[in-house]
């Protein structure tokens, strides 16, 4: 009440202030001055003119003066009309002004409405109020004015025509979200014009119309964005990226909501370009997860451009560098797969648009099914690698420096090898892809193997290649059971291999040819791309990546090649051939097992080593299965034989790889030769034992005879020829080593291979042969046992060191693996010093001799032998 009384007093004082002539009435001039001075922030100039024109409505008695009674009634009648109009505006849509007093028309501007309201309201009070002029007091007038101001402050009674649009817009925000920017722009203009300039409403009204157009333009722009995003979503769906599409829709809706706000807060007079920029800025204000979306669409940031460009450009650059070091003719072929990958990545960029980082992984996973995942698979793995290890430019110089010495020494021989390899590549069809991928960054395999394992687990869930994993696990489990069932091992072996053939055929029929091609394509890429550069460590690393379907996707670079080659009809043909060979090899090896004690000790040793290297790249394979365990320590020769190569795009590659890796193992065991020398007699006895063993295998192994009847005949011839070639090639690089020493090392390598296989597939026949051979070699058992114990104790520690060293230096891989194989070889030699040397040879050599492409691969092996010596 006290406030109300003060306001009334203010109205009275105001009236008397302007009633100067007689202090009781207001003339037309005085009333005009009062309205202009006191109500200028309420009324528009047009309203003041309307009051002046319609002054006769206020001057009811037509005496030319307005008394206080007339003034009070007229003002409150007018304020009542304004209040009702304000309430109707607040409760209805904008521009729909209620006319409780029967206004004649709506001009589209609140100003005109207020003028009409004034006119109507005053006309209705005309009959009721008769105001004699000069009867009002200035105190009454000031009270009236304060009442008007109070109404203006009242949140419900915003009677000002100037602020009406603001209240209206604020109220209608919840209903019309796209107009929110208009009201905000008006608020800004009105705050600026708070000084009370009566011309502000005109300026505000024009921006209102302009801002309406802006908001409609914003809506149209948002709809355009929706249309574009829907087009992107359709494109993504066609390529199998529904997940990325959902992200695009979410992002599109957010962008539409935010862009009107940001655009209209720019001044209403802004151009459409400014609005687009504002919309982009509004979307850029999203969380960081959404930020790359708009950047990918309109303003790609340096990070986004760098990642795909690095992913695409880095492949050709690395491939060209490594290929140029090896052969100029191969360089022309090598960049082709990266170009295809770059096209895929470019398409991914255009299709994904805003969703580059948001939905990168889901998109790639789904798209891999449609595109068969070659380049996309690599894109994911390589981007993850690049995010963790940037810049890639640092990786290439390190590798180039490391391999530079090896390249110079092997350049002359690579000239001849590469010419033959060129023919091999043309015959191999899409094997060029695997070469290029292998040449990309072999050193990265070891460094990124930790990430690779996690990626393999993720990728295997989405990629079709993972369908072959159950078969491999069943294989591992069944082969493990072979060790524990000594009585029925031969029978189970035959059944298992028959089953494996069916399984592999089934998986291939289900469209998971990449499973069969996966390991195989990695095998050829290792000899082709790493010949002169990587030496032993990287060849071992690559071969270890080949092993096991559980790790078949560990290396994202390798996995990218699988899908493309698996569609090749030649690849499918070679799959069948390689399956038959694998059945034959497994059957032959099944009869050559070692006693179960050695098997258990090997398993324990490998498990101990595996526990220390769980973070290790090549040795990341699960250690629970003996089959996988043997892969880790088994030499590349054995790796290229069975599950490492379920099917090859080029059968010759498989054979070549097995032959090619033998001298690598020989060089890695130069130290072993000094520790455990054997005599010519042992070698001769070993050869005789091998011939006997081959004969017994021919009699007892029906599977191998049915699968490949001519294999064993070639096996008897191949060891001597292979030994001669390898001894010559090794002589060139290491003249100090005698030919007999080379043969000895070769036999030891092969012995190691078959002893490990024998550990899985021991049989009564082989045990009988083993006892016979053990009697001949009792002389050297004590010496070998001591050395084996020393090395086996040291090997877990070496493995542990290897897990940390592999991330920083690739050369440590070769050294550690060499020592581990030496330890295992010494450990095995206490049981079978010279028993099986030709076994591995007989399996690997016929594979190399059956195909014309074997010799180039064997010749390419020589640079690897050079690489092993410096790394040791």
From Swiss-Prot:
Residues 117-759, 774-813, 830-872 are annotated as: Disordered. Pfam families: S_100. The lineage of its organism: Eukaryota, Metazoa, Chordata, Craniata, Vertebrata. It comes from Bos taurus (Bovine). Disulfide bonds: none annotated. Residues 142-155, 164-190, 218-235, 296-307, 324-348, 365-375, 399-435, 486-505, 571-584, 592-608, 664-684, 730-751, 849-865 have a biased composition (Basic and acidic residues). InterPro entries: EF-hand-dom_pair (IPR011992), S-100_dom (IPR034325), S100_Ca-bd_sub (IPR013787), TCHHL1 (IPR042937). GO terms for molecular function: transition metal ion binding. This is Trichohyalin-like protein 1. Residues 46-81 form the EF-hand domain. Residues 117-127, 538-570, 699-708, 718-729, 774-793, 801-812 have a biased composition (Polar residues).
């Amino acid at each position: 009440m006290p406030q109300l009384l003060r306001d009334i007093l203010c109205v009275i004082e105001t009236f008397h202030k302007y009633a100067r002539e007689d202090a009781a009435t207001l003339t037309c001039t005085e009333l005009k001055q009062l309205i202009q001075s006191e109500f200028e922030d309420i009324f528009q100039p047009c309203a003041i003119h309307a009051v002046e024109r319609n002054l006769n409505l206020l001057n009811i008695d037509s005496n030319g003066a307005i008394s206080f009674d007339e003034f009070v009634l007229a003002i409150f009648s007018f304020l009542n009309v304004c209040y009702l109009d304000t309430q109707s505006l607040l409760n209805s849509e904008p521009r729909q002004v209620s006319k409780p007093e029967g206004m004649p028309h709506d001009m589209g501007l609140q100003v005109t409405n207020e003028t009409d309201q004034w006119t109507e309201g005053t006309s209705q009070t005309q009959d009721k109020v008769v105001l004699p002029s000069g009867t009002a007091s200035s105190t009454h007038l000031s009270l009236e004015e304060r009442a008007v101001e109070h109404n203006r402050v009242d949140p419900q009674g915003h009677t000002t025509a100037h602020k009406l649009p603001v209240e209206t817009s604020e109220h209608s925000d919840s209903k019309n979200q796209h107009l929110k920017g208009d009201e905000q722009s008006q608020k800004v203009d009105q705050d600026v014009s708070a000084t009370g300039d009566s011309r502000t409403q005109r300026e505000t009204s024009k921006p209102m119309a302009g801002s309406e157009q802006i908001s409609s333009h914003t809506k149209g722009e948002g709809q355009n964005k929706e249309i574009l995003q829907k087009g992107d979503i359709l494109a993504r769906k066609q390529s199998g990226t529904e997940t990325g599409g959902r992200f695009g829709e979410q992002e599109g809706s957010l962008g539409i909501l935010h862009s009107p706000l940001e655009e209209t807060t720019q001044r209403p007079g802004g151009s459409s370009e400014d609005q687009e920029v504002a919309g982009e800025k509004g979307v850029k204000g999203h969380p960081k997860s959404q930020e790359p979306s708009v950047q990918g669409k309109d303003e790609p940031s340096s990070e986004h451009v760098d990642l795909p460009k690095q992913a695409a450009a880095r492949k050709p650059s690395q491939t060209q560098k490594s290929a140029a070091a090896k052969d100029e003719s191969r360089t022309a072929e090598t960049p082709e797969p990266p170009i295809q990958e770059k096209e895929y990545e470019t398409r991914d960029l255009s299709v994904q648009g805003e969703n580059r980082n948001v939905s990168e992984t889901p998109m790639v996973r789904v798209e891999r099914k449609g595109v068969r995942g070659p380049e996309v698979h690599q894109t994911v793995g390589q981007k993850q690698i690049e995010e963790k290890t940037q810049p890639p430019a640092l990786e290439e110089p390190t590798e180039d420096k490391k391999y530079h010495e090896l390249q110079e020494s092997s350049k002359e021989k690579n000239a001849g090898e590469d010419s033959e390899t060129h023919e091999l590549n043309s015959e191999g069809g899409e094997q060029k892809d695997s070469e290029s991928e292998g040449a990309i960054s072999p050193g990265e395999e070891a460094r990124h193997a930790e990430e690779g394992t996690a990626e393999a687990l993720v990728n295997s869930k989405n990629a079709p290649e993972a369908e072959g994993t159950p078969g491999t696990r069943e294989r591992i489990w069944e082969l493990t059971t072979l060790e524990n069932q000594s009585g029925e091992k031969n029978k189970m072996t035959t059944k298992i291999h028959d089953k494996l053939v069916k399984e592999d055929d089934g998986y291939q029929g289900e469209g998971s040819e990449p499973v069969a091609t996966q390991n195989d394509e990695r095998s050829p890429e290792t000899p082709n791309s790493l010949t002169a550069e990587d030496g032993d460590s990287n060849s071992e690393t690559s071969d270890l990546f080949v092993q096991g379907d559980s790790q078949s996707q560990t290396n994202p670079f390798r996995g990218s090649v699988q899908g493309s080659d698996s569609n090749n009809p030649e690849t499918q043909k070679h799959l069948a051939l390689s399956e038959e060979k694998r059945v034959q090899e497994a059957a032959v090896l099944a009869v050559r097992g070692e006693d179960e004690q050695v098997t258990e000790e090997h398993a324990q040793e490998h498990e101990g080593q595996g526990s220390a290297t769980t973070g290790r790249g090549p040795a990341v394979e699960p250690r629970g299965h003996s089959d996988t365990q043997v892969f880790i320590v088994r030499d590349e020769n054995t790796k290229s034989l069975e599950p490492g190569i379920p099917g090859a795009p080029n059968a010759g590659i498989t054979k070549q790889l097995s032959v090619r890796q033998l001298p690598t193992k020989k060089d890695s065991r130069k130290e072993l030769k000094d520790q455990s020398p054997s005599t010519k007699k042992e070698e001769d006895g070993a050869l005789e034992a091998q011939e006997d063993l081959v004969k017994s295998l021919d009699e007892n192994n029906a599977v191998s005879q049915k699968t490949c009847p001519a294999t064993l005949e070639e096996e008897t011839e191949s060891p001597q020829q292979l030994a001669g070639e390898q001894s010559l090639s090794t002589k060139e690089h290491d003249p100090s080593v005698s030919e007999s020493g080379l043969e000895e090392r070769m036999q030891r390598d092969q012995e190691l291979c078959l002893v490990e296989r024998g550990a899985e597939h021991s049989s009564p026949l082989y045990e009988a042969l083993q006892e016979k051979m053990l009697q001949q070699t009792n002389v050297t058992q004590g010496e070998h046992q001591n050395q084996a114990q020393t090395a086996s104790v040291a090997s877990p520690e070496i493995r542990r060191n290897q897990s940390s060293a592999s991330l920083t230096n690739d050369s440590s891989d070769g050294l550690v693996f060499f020592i581990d194989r030496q330890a295992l070889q010494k450990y095995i030699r206490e049981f079978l010093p010279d028993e099986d040397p030709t076994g591995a040879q007989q399996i690997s050599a016929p594979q190399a001799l059956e195909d014309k492409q074997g010799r180039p691969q064997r010749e390419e092996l020589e640079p690897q032998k050079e690489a092993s010596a410096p790394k040791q």
